[in-house]
């Protein structure tokens, strides 16, 4: 990396240190390094399982861009060349570098079948079905405890389960946090989508129907245009949760109580999966070879540990001024 590029990168990191992104995953107990912002300053850029994007200031996609490709996998995202391998029914841990405590909101995970090679698929043709969600967990205090808070408490890690009955193949997993701290006014919500290629194995046969990325949300959805600083019954945005029967859980028309129950159940399941699998990456040896996917069996401990240096919760709580611009 040239000195000028290094200087630009260091300045960018200092300016947006409060925001984060998914730097790696643990898929079925194996760690894979994702796309890193620093990759954009390397020539050539190393191959990765994570989709590259031009969101180098770690900013967000606003509701005004919901009908554009930027909502799918972040700003001007391009296909990842590699894929992480995982079996249907296994868990996947998304490791965020850091997240501001003030950026409360839901955590949502989708899958889309590439029906071929995910390295060349047109992202605008991907049809996403929701496999995991968490929203408002506890509203005893304002603004409440959210899925984003649970992720922070779990060392900036969120766990989801790949459905056991879906057909094997190449998929894009779309994982995002929607920050709602400014969502009380139109175009105030902040979406932080992340996309990763998966090669899913198994004996399932189901091919769930999905929704195009540009049609997942509208700017006036009740879970998007919402004031979290007032008492509320929160509805998680997006299409219905997928399940084997084809019925939805926590749909847009679901009652608030049903939504809350679904969130608690989902979050509890995520916590128990982390404890049961005991997958961690605190001692992962990351390969330095450019273009090679990092694939290392995680050592058994009781806590997921991010490979990248983790910022403290105190640092995360400082709201970055640029995010509300």
From Swiss-Prot:
Its EC number is 1.14.99.56. InterPro entries: AA9 (IPR049892), AA9_LPMO (IPR005103). Lignocellulose is the most abundant polymeric composite on Earth and is a recalcitrant but promising renewable substrate for industrial biotechnology applications. Together with cellobiose dehydrogenases (CDHs) an enzymatic system capable of oxidative cellulose cleavage is formed, which increases the efficiency of cellulases and put LPMOs at focus of biofuel research. Binds 1 copper ion per subunit. Transmembrane segments: none annotated. Its cofactor is Cu(2+). Keywords: Carbohydrate metabolism, Cellulose degradation, Copper, Disulfide bond, Glycoprotein, Metal-binding, Monooxygenase, Oxidoreductase, Polysaccharide degradation, Secreted, Signal. This is AA9 family lytic polysaccharide monooxygenase G. It comes from Botryotinia fuckeliana (strain B05.10).
């Amino acid at each position: 990396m040239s000195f000028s590029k290094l200087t630009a990168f260091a300045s960018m990191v200092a300016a947006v240190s409060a925001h984060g992104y998914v730097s790696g995953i643990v898929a079925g107990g194996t760690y894979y390094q994702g796309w890193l912002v620093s990759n954009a300053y390397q020539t050539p850029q190393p191959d990765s399982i994570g989709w590259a994007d031009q969101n180098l200031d770690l900013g967000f996609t606003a509701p005004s861009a919901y009908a554009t490709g930027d909502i799918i996998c972040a700003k001007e995202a391009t296909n990842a060349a590699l894929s992480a391998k995982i079996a249907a029914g296994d868990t996947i841990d998304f490791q965020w570098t850091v997240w501001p405590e003030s950026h409360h909101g839901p955590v949502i995970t989708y899958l889309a079948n590439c029906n071929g090679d995910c390295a060349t698929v047109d992202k605008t043709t991907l049809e996403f079905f929701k496999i995991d969600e968490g929203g408002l967990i506890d509203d005893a205090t304002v603004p409440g405890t959210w899925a984003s808070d649970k992720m922070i408490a779990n060392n900036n890690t969120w766990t989801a389960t790949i459905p056991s009955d879906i057909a094997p193949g190449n998929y894009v997993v779309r994982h995002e946090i929607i920050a709602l701290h400014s969502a009380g006014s139109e175009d105030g919500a902040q979406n932080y989508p992340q996309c990763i290629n998966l090669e899913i194995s198994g004996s399932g046969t189901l091919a769930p129907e999905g929704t195009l990325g540009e049609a997942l949300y509208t700017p006036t959805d009740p879970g998007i245009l919402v004031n979290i600083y007032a008492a509320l019954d929160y509805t998680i945005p997006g299409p219905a949760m997928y399940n084997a029967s084809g019925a939805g859980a926590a749909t847009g028309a679901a009652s608030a109580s049903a939504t809350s129950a679904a969130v608690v159940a989902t979050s509890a399941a995520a916590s128990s999966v982390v404890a049961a699998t005991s997958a961690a990456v605190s001692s992962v040896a990351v390969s330095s070879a450019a273009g090679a996917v990092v694939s290392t069996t995680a050592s058994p401990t009781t806590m997921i540990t991010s490979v990248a240096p983790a910022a403290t919760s105190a640092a995360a709580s400082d709201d970055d001024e640029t995010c509300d611009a």
